[in-house]
Structures are given as structure tokens and as C-alpha cells.
Amino acid sequence: MRLVIARCSVDYAGRLTAHLPSAPRLILVKADGSVSIHADDRAYKPLNWMSPPCTLKEGADGEAGVWTVVNKAGEKLIITMEEVLHDSSYELGVDPGLIKDGVEAHLQELLADRIEILGEGHTLIRREYPTAIGPVDILCRDANGQTVAVELKRRGDIDGVEQLTRYLELLNRDPHLAPVRGVFAAQEIKPQARVLATDRGIGCLVLDYDAMRGIEDDKLRLF
């Protein structure tokens, strides 16, 4: 993790153009290759960012104070440094990730046990499928043999869709798994999250936790 605090301006060139005028900002460069630019008044949300995979070149075009960040689609972030106030790097190592609350963990267990809830013919590959950026809740195959990555939440918001998007970008680089499609599953999915998921070709599934627990209870009573 590299943290840079600098007075800088930022220009984005891609599907549209955007400009951030000169101001003091925090720039985060993460080990996964992502670059994000933050102000002091937007909670955790960046002003602009570039998701991995992307490349960062410092001093592009012979200018020591210019950073150029380019993603695989050719979109660019050009960060013009006027004054660097802080620049430090820390090796954080592999994060263990969030420990799911009881409901999310139980949802994962129930869905893995009754994978046909996702559709007839689905088969489980494994729960907590490990990746370089954290475990995928459920990895399975559909009736056609296509790999499916499932992200589970109690309440599905945009952050969950973004998380699943990152997993899909990574998994689709594996020739043994690709093509991989995504399913965003939650007890409740917010409208904005559903719109974003649909735009990215990610399926949405609303889970009835009480009904799923009822399925489990019936199974236990049979034995």
C-alpha cells in the first residue's frame, strides 16, 4: 500500500472526460494495482479511481510530476503533482477478510447445501473459493457447465456488486474457469445495486432466509 498526500489536479479520459482542479488530496496505490484519489469530505468514496488491472507510470512524457494510470480498456487517469506533502509505502500482506456475521455465514451454508436454488442442474465447486483478493462466497457450475461466482450479503448494496465485479475480473483470467458469470444474492437488494449489477451482466437473486431455514429444518426432521 502506497499513500501519497499531494496538491494535485486530475484528468480522466475514457468513455467521458472529467477534471479535478488543483487541491490537496490523498492518493492510494494498492498492491492489486488499483489507484484511487480521495478528498477529506467524502467518507470512504474516492473522487476518482482506476480498478485493476492497470499500469502506473510516473514521470510520463518526461514530466517528473505527472502520473499516468491506464487500464485494460485504454482509459487514463492523469495526475499532475504540484507539491508532494507525504509519500510512504507499507507492506500490509494478505488480509484475512471480513468475518461474516451469523446470518451471512448461515446463508452461505444453506445455499451451498441447496445449490439448486440458483437453478436446476447447478453443482457446487466449493465454498470460500480462494483468490488473490479474497475468497468468493460460492463457486459452482450451472447446467451448461459454465462457472458461476456467487457473492452473498444480508443487504445487497453497490459495494457488494463492486466486490463481485473484482472477483469476476480475476476469475475470468483463469482459462480453467472462464467464462465466469456472477450472481449477486442477498435477502434484500437495493435498487441502485440491482441497476449496477444488471448493467454489468450480473444476475440478482433475493434469498428468503426464513424459507431456507425451513428447508434445513425439514431436512433435519427427515433424518
UniProtKB/Swiss-Prot annotation:
Any Pfam family hit: NucS_C
The compartments listed are:
Cytoplasm
The enzyme class is: hydrolase
MF terms in GO = DNA binding; single-stranded DNA endodeoxyribonuclease activity
Would I find Nuclease among this entry's keywords? Answer: yes
- Keyword hit for Thylakoid: no
Q: Keywords of this protein's UniProt record, alphabetized?
A: Cytoplasm, DNA-binding, Endonuclease, Hydrolase, Nuclease
Query: Mind naming one GO cellular-component term on file for this protein?
Result: cytoplasm
EC number(s): the record gives 3.1.-.-
The record's InterPro entries line, in alphabetical order, gives: Endonuclease_NucS, NucS_C, NucS_N, NucS_N_sf, tRNA_endonuc-like_dom_sf
| Location (main, coarse) | cytoplasm
List the PANTHER family hit by this protein, alphabetically: ENDONUCLEASE NUCS
General function of this protein: Cleaves both 3' and 5' ssDNA extremities of branched DNA structures.
The text of the family note is: Belongs to the NucS endonuclease family.
Q: What is this protein called?
A: Endonuclease NucS
Gene coding for it: nucS
